[in-house]
Swiss-Prot record:
Function (record text): One of the primary rRNA binding proteins, it binds directly to 16S rRNA central domain where it helps coordinate assembly of the platform of the 30S subunit.
Protein name: Small ribosomal subunit protein uS8
Quaternary data: Part of the 30S ribosomal subunit. Contacts proteins S5 and S12.
One annotated GO molecular function: rRNA binding
GO biological process: translation
Swiss-Prot/TrEMBL keywords: Ribonucleoprotein, Ribosomal protein, RNA-binding, rRNA-binding
Family membership noted in the UniProt record: Belongs to the universal ribosomal protein uS8 family.
Superkingdom of the source species: Bacteria
Pfam families reported in the protein's UniProt record: Ribosomal_S8 (PF00410)
GO CC annotation terms, alphabetical: ribonucleoprotein complex; ribosome
Amino acid sequence: MSMQDPIADMLTRIRNGQAANKVAISMPSSKLKVAIANVLAAEGYIESVKVLEGAKPELEITLKYFQGKPVVESIQRVSRPGLRIYKRKDELPKVMGGLGVAVVSTSKGVMTDRAARQAGLGGEIICYVA
């Protein structure tokens, strides 16, 4: 059976992996998933990202904890296949008053809301992370 929303599945695997105190999680890889994971790693929400090549590439994410607690407090899908959410540069949301990040897919690639605002770009709001 095909997966309807692979990005939501990725976010759920991260959420469940941290709830179970897993060191690392793996999932089927795609360019968008790797780009989202790289943004999360750059922002310090996950430890590392690795793509395991093969007939079906796997994405391995090493989760991050601080004093035994998960670094990611909440991770929430915003734009979904049934209802895409697009925002202009001046409409980009600030997650938790700037403490969290919104992951945005722009014409220049996947980036945080802060980076998109600086670059003067809008795009599809993929998820909120806090």
